[in-house]
Design a protein with these regions (language model features):
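Membrane-interface junctions at the ends of membrane-embedded or membrane-associated helices
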Residues: 1-6, 110, 157-172
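Start-transfer (signal-anchor) and selected internal transmembrane alpha helices
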Residues: 1-22, 170
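Membrane-proximal lumenal/periplasmic loop motifs of glycosylation machinery
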Residues: 27-36, 50-75, 79, 86-87
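Extracytosolic (periplasmic/ER-lumenal) interhelical loops and adjacent juxtamembrane/interface segments
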Residues: 42-47
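Membrane-interface micro-motifs in multi-pass membrane enzymes
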Residues: 63, 67, 115-161, 186-187
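Membrane-helix interface segments
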Residues: 84-87, 112-119, 166-173
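Transmembrane-helix motifs of polytopic, lipid-linked glycan transferases
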Residues: 91-116, 152-155
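Membrane-interface alpha helices of multi-pass inner-membrane proteins
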Residues: 171-187
């Protein structure tokens, strides 16, 4: 029992360390990493905040469709802080990292991992483990919505496979179908 508790505390400490390091990385390193793609995400959020919408009919990307993407986080923040893009970017990335950690934990638990291992998975999912990961997930946040959706999809699929109650299975299946359509519309 004592060893199990120690393992849980160790996992919680590692998760907290990962979260603190990622938070510090986002807050302290913001200025060094802003590029035109990141700025365009904020320009879209500013545009949507002025329109009062989360999805724009007047802004189009040349290569993708955006339904469930970073604008769902950045736009409300831009409406709250329209003159502080740095704050919007930093808070938005922190919120997206929290969503990524939560979805990783859900996925791990749904796949049958013990709480401590799911917590480690959540911590590692928000850790800067390479330059590319930092650019695309941590700082850029471009693929965080896709990673969150994938974690949710895998977790729900695992729950569907283990759920025995017919009514719950139908509910999970309906969620998976809706999530599939949203993922398809969010290329």
């Amino acid at each position: 029992m004592k060893q199990k508790r120690l393992g849980g505390l160790c996992a919680a400490a590692i998760f907290l360390l990962c979260a603190l390091m990622t938070g510090f990385y986002l807050i302290a390193g913001y200025g060094a990493y802003l590029d035109s793609d990141m700025a365009s995400e904020l320009a879209l959020a500013s545009h949507l905040a002025k329109e009062g919408a989360l999805i724009s009919s007047t802004w189009a990307y040349s290569t993708e469709v955006r339904v469930l993407s970073t604008q769902l986080v950045f736009t409300p923040l831009m409406a709250l802080f329209p003159h502080n893009w740095r704050l919007v970017r930093t808070l938005g990335c922190l919120i997206l990292q929290a969503a990524l950690a939560a979805s990783a934990y859900f996925c791990g638990r749904s796949l049958g991992a013990r709480k401590r291992f799911a917590l480690l998975f959540a911590g590692l999912s928000i850790s800067v483990c390479s330059v590319v990961y930092a650019q695309m997930i941590t700082i850029g946040a471009y693929y965080v919505p896709h990673a969150v959706l994938t974690n949710l999809y895998v977790g729900l699929t695992a729950r569907l496979m283990t759920e025995r109650k017919h009514g719950r299975r139908r509910g999970i299946l309906a969620l998976l179908i809706a999530l599939s359509m949203l993922m398809g519309a969010s290329s």
